[in-house]
């Protein structure tokens, strides 16, 4: 027997649905009913139903009402009648909305929205009322859909935060219809034909179809799960469609969100030799479930012709005209393809230093930094956004006072560089003096003068050896000093930090002490977002010679490539992962590590120096986002010992899983070139971090025997953009506010803490209200398990004194925190890095 639904669809009749409806009617009135009695009533209902094709849902419900009344269940029958009327009202409002918009397909979507959002604060009647206030005569259907979506966005409140998910579904409905129509007009069907079209138009890299057969693409198409589009918030989907999916040259989005995730997966699995399609599926699943996000360049550029997948690069600027201009040129090429940059200026001679024996000839680092600043502005990625660069200088460099005023508003504008991000590299000695005696003298010196007089570069040392040599330089009368007090430097640092959010802080001795590859080099500074800590070395000029090749005269310049650091980033979305499930977490980490390792071999490098270093060390940076989200949904307060204990357990779990996955990958594909002699190989890595349990000792033995695939593993990036995509909190930061409205290009965007509810409300304490000492302690706890660094911000209010801010720096240093990113004053707006937004 069949039954006709209200939509007109004829489906098989299922009597258990009647039984369930009657059960719900009784339970809704708080009454229990014997199954035997229910069966008897069901039998009566069934006898009264027609056996011909005229059976409808309405007829069945009419009979249920009558039987309930006849059996004396008047209150239940009354509730059932009211329930039917409520359902009828729901049907009317969605039918009215679909008719008003002029989109018949909209009704099915609205029906699903009513089913998924049953709470009273999400009535479609409210959406209809808001929509009608936006609606104007003669609006097109597309304009009406935009108005409907805008209505849902503006209904998002603290009390009803899920409207942002409803708005996302409406936006996706509009996009999907338009996208399907675009492809239909061109006669393109199926994923393979889409990829062929995009490849022919130069929008998709031809390497995808060259490496995958049609059968494999068809198999991959079967992995697509459009239902996962419902995981998006409005902000996330809007950002993805505007910035991440492949667009036509007229800025029309051509990929669906799921096709984007699959395209990235196809790219990242391209070189797999065993079980390749299984890896495609695993990569696709981790991305589309929003359990892992790749860095913004990987998300944007994987599958494209110019697939620059790395976030950030670090260069050591040499102390020569050729070397400085080479570094600036390198920055321009990196910026051209969307990468951010970290530049270490600690080797460049100070103002007044000698050039070729001419005393006082050097102009110092500021003029070169201004050149970098102008390059950042000039190379603006086809007008999309200007380049981004952090410039690092040592705390004992003679030009430090001027450097600390690069971005402040007061002073000589010829000494300013407002578009770079300054950062200071601090030795332990500086913090020891700041802790004990702020009035202690602090000597600033020129690195070139030290090299000339002493025969060594002071910046090439760290720890006790650096301190011994620094004091030796201080006592050497041949070296000119610029004497200040520690307080003078601290005051300049804090004044700039409060006013501009910078300089970033880099604790060089802590970094190098915990460097697992200290046997192979030195870490001078970090990257644009302060999460990368890898060995560095300047590019060196060897020779320039004139040759004749094929009858032509050519000039050949030879250089030693140095170590030009590359950041390959991804982040675990902790708020979306069951972090207590060790097996699930291990599998997710294993998948992410493999994807990152593949980035190294599949990347388009803007510079050969970057390619050489990346293949030498095979460094990656797996980080996290959704940290506050993770805590809040588990009812853990930020300012609590429970937070510290939980973070310690989670990050130890992540680190263990990462090392285990990486050594297994080394067994399969081989070690990085410099594994021998590293802390990984000697076991010092595990000893320094107090990993002494049985399972850690066993893992250390496995690592020593099998090796490591990647020299560096973990680094926590800011994830400012990709955390929006995945609907979670950024990086390791607390939320700025539980809820606020952001105006962008004339529209209002709601920003809601993830899974905000009465249960999570009290655990989402705003960043500026949190006692920052808890954030510093948490960073120290996490740092033990992170071989690189963390993009950690400090949030201060106008009530903070300079001494309180200094205390946070000192606490961070004592806790073993390697870097501090922005000092975010409540009244200060700072720029987030796009490149490291993993």
Feature roles, as predicted:
Residues 286, 328, 588-611, 619, ...:
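Internal maturation/activation junctions in enzymes
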Residues 174-227, 310-571, 578-579, 605-609, ...:
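Active-site cavity-forming subdomains of large catalytic enzyme subunits
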Residues 79-93, 163-195, 426, 512-538, ...:
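Terminal amphipathic helices with adjacent charged low-complexity linkers/tails
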Residues 66-69, 139, 154, 232-243, ...:
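Core structural elements
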Residues 9, 32-262, 278-284:
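Core nucleic-acid recognition elements
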Residues 213-221, 225, 229-238, 530-534, ...:
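Catalytic alpha/beta core of large soluble enzyme barrels
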Residues 252-322, 469-496, 500-505, 651-701:
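Gly/Pro-rich turn-and-neighbor structural signature
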Residues 142, 147, 178-183, 229-377:
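Long, structured ligand/cofactor-binding scaffold of large enzymes
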